[in-house]
Amino acid sequence: MATTTSENVPVFSSLESVYGGDGGSQLEEVQIRYDNLKSKFQQVFGHLPDVFARSPGRVNLIGEHIDYEGYSVLPMAIRQDTIIAIRKHDDSESPKQVRIANLNEEKYAMCTYPADPEQDIDLKNHKWGHYFICGYKGFHEFAKSKGVDVGVPVGLDVLVDGTVPTGSGLSSSAAFVCSSTIALMAVFDVNFPKKEIAQLTCECERHIGTQSGGMDQAISVMAKSGFAALIDFNPIHATDVQLPAGGTFVIAHSLAESQKAVTAATNYNNRVVECRLASIVLGIKLGMKPEEALSKVKTLSDVEGLCVSYADSRGSSNPVLAVKEFLKEEPYTAEDIQEIIQENLESVFSSSSSSLDVLKAAKHFKLFQRASHVYSEAKRVYAFKETVLSKLSDEEMLQKLGDLMNDSHHSCSVLYECSCPELEELVKVCRDNGALGARLTGAGWGGCAVALVKENIVPQFILNLKEQFYQSRIDKGVINKNELGLYVFASNPSSGAAILKV
């Protein structure tokens, strides 16, 4: 394993430097994409773009819903990406506006915003262009904090083309925010270390109301072609992971869209709140005073040491032992928790409007289940890494990795409850057709599954998925048969974010 260094985002003058590993015909397709972007940019805005930026989607191989709890995850970048073409107006040009267009103009109408980094994002009126404004606000805030003068706000013309399926669990939103932020850096002629951009873009996405943990942005920015990555946090750090020979990851969309920003209060952000409450309750049960736990404990990783100490006194090192002892399996009411922590829940989360939205929507809180998932999933990530580093044969290694993926899915489904009927059906079809392991990937509640498949059966495996999962959806008109390649595909680990002057 090699550590990914904190060098700046690379700047390339040829597409081959970024996409070359994909081979001739795919490189030609990429060239057509960029040519189309240039042509459309000229048509829409009357000028050519100054520069391009791209950032890929990702598939998380293992480590779901634990990044925001401070634990490491193991994703890889995929070939599908978001490309931003951008042009900066001269100071004299008016009006001072940020105009954001999309190559898919039928689905995404042009959005126009004031050229004002201080503007608020209207979360009640969800627009696709908000993701660019997340990057816009974050870039200006970060430049200011670094003492970098980017001048008075000027107008910007922006054209977007994304091939990461939306609502797929493959981080289309992170690819959009990362490419937006990097495009802004490029057009203002500044560059920052990758790890700083990964942290910045994670914070950017919070402008849209999603309490992101940072994995999606970190792998999108820091990925290296041919390698998955172990992503650590606080500080963000990436270690290249070489996967065993003979296996391929197949990504398949359940066709249930996961609208993370729209359903945050009942799904994604709800789990963030439940984990925080579980960590505070555990801290108190394990000896902390309530006021100390409330001020110091933010994530389950903050109380892992106390949990392990308790487990150690009983001859174990597993923090789940403390969870089983001190958290009840039945859901907690707000009143139950307030009695333990001696504080009103609204006061605990008073600084987070998205968390307050969760409290308004929640009827109860499943602390035992959420903490059990986080601690067991964190152990699986390191078991995955240790397996890759072991002296097992490739065959044994692939089998072990598949078992870990299956265990992960069970935990996501039963303990974290972030699956859905379509994902359950898809995962079963994958396993029935020879996948060594299959699990939901991404936030869940829709989106994609990832399956570890022996290389020599990949074509037949994909064909079987088409027949046994997708054909009925094609017959019902859910998707077009000609678009099937967008929804199920094999992927090798791809390269990360880049600036392109082509």
PLM feature spans:
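C-terminal nucleotide
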Residues: 1-58, 62, 70, 83, ...
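Glycine/serine-rich anion-binding loops at beta->alpha junctions
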Residues: 54-69, 161-180, 430, 434-452
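DPxDG-like acidic metal-binding loop motif
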Residues: 77-80, 170-190, 453-454
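Beta-strand segments within the central parallel beta-sheet cores of soluble alpha/beta enzyme folds
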Residues: 99-101, 149-161, 192-203, 400-404, ...
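Glycine- and acidic-rich phosphate- and metal-coordinating loops
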Residues: 116, 136-137, 141-164
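Phosphate-handling active-site elements
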Residues: 142-154, 184-200, 455-468, 472-477
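Alpha/beta catalytic cores of group-transfer enzymes, especially the acyltransferase/condensing modules
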Residues: 191-238, 438-441, 490-495
